[in-house]
Swiss-Prot record:
Chain residues that bind ATP: 11-16
InterPro entries according to UniProt: Depp_CoAkinase (IPR001977), P-loop_NTPase (IPR027417)
PANTHER family (alphabetical): BIFUNCTIONAL COENZYME A SYNTHASE-RELATED (PTHR10695:SF46), DEPHOSPHO-COA KINASE-RELATED (PTHR10695)
Gene Ontology MF, one: dephospho-CoA kinase activity
Main location: cytoplasm
Organism of this sequence: Geobacter sulfurreducens (strain ATCC 51573 / DSM 12127 / PCA)
Record function comment: Catalyzes the phosphorylation of the 3'-hydroxyl group of dephosphocoenzyme A to form coenzyme A.
Protein name: Dephospho-CoA kinase
CDD domains: DPCK
A Pfam family per the record: CoaE
């Protein structure tokens, strides 16, 4: 099984790229979805997060309020590191389980989509790193529109992540997503045809 590690900055278009790859025949494992599973009430990660950040980050049903937690971790790098020390091992374990299931089922191409693939040291579990690249201004505009954030809040979130240029330098494949959706789809189809003829 070929495993593509799909990464990119916030609002770079990773989900759009993953949908195109699914259409081409890949099976996608989304680290964000695994993160939601890993911190569900009753899990050890959930208990550790509440112990680290307090009950003020909980919704009435006991689930983690991602927006409240996000406002803490994007404002404080030590808080972000504390959260990542809790969540990354739990996400890694879930990803390994999913990848093992896919290997057993004979899936030819899997995509592990993770915004922090490189930062979390997860590149060793993939065969190739594909980076979805957009320029910073496009990223800021997309984050503001998608998440309803102010420019300064969007800039703060971008500052908390590895710069796009550094991420792109670590990828075996860089997918430019500054153009139209049609251009993006065409680029991915060309890359796919070369990689998986």
């Amino acid at each position: 099984m070929n495993i593509i590690g799909l990464t990119g900055g916030i609002a770079s278009g990773k989900s759009t790229v993953s949908r195109i790859l699914e259409r081409l025949g890949a099976v996608v494992i989304d680290a964000d979805q695994l993160a939601r599973e890993a911190v569900m009430p009753g899990t050890s990660a959930h208990r550790s997060i509440v112990a680290a950040f307090g009950e003020g980050i909980l919704l009435p049903d006991g689930a983690i309020d991602r927006k409240a937690l996000g406002s803490i971790i994007f404002a404080d790098s030590s808080a972000r590191k504390r959260l990542e020390a809790i969540t990354h091992p739990a996400i890694r374990d879930l990803a390994e389980l999913r990848l093992a299931e896919l290997r057993r089922s004979g899936v030819p191409v899997a995509v592990y989509m993770a915004a922090l693939l490189i930062e979390a040291g997860a590149t060793d579990r993939v065969d190739e790193v594909w980076v979805v690249y957009v320029d910073r201004e496009t990223q800021v505009r997309r984050v503001m529109a998608r998440d309803g954030l102010s420019r300064s809040e969007a800039e703060q979130r971008l500052a908390a992540q590895m710069p796009m240029e550094e991420k792109a330098a670590r990828g075996q494949v860089v997918i430019d997503n500054n153009g139209t959706p049609e251009e993006l789809e065409r680029r991915i189809e060309e890359i796919w045809a070369k990689r998986f003829p």
